From Swiss-Prot:
Gene Ontology CC annotations of this record: plasma membrane
Native organism: Pseudomonas aeruginosa (strain UCBPP-PA14)
Protein known as: Putative membrane protein insertion efficiency factor
Keyword Cell inner membrane found: yes
Pfam families found in the cross-reference section: YidD
PANTHER family in the record: MEMBRANE PROTEIN INSERTION EFFICIENCY FACTOR-RELATED (PTHR33383:SF1)
Length: 86
């Protein structure tokens, strides 16, 4: 799934985007943001972050610098190590 999404974004970047020109209000552009989000967070969360970004990319939003959030490791109880004495 991840490779399919990346392939679709790359197709857009090389085949469609040059025809319509730069229109994104953000840096990095929405397609680059989504590509990076999928690489960092995986297909599901990265796709969600990219979709949220696309919904904010409209004429009434000021845009600006909006990097992909860093991955936050959340260990569930099954992966935590017990401290001595517990």
């Amino acid at each position: 799934m991840k490779f399919l999404l990346i392939g679709l974004i790359r197709f857009y970047q090389y085949a469609i985007s040059p025809l319509i020109g730069p229109r994104c209000r953000f840096y990095p552009s929405c397609s680059h943001y989504t590509l990076e989000a999928i690489r960092v967070h995986g297909a599901l969360r990265g796709g969600y972050l990219g979709a949220r970004r696309l919904l904010r990319c409209h004429p009434w939003h000021p845009g600006g610098y909006d990097p992909v959030p860093e991955r936050q490791e959340q260990a569930c109880a099954c992966h935590r190590t017990a401290k001595p004495g517990e």
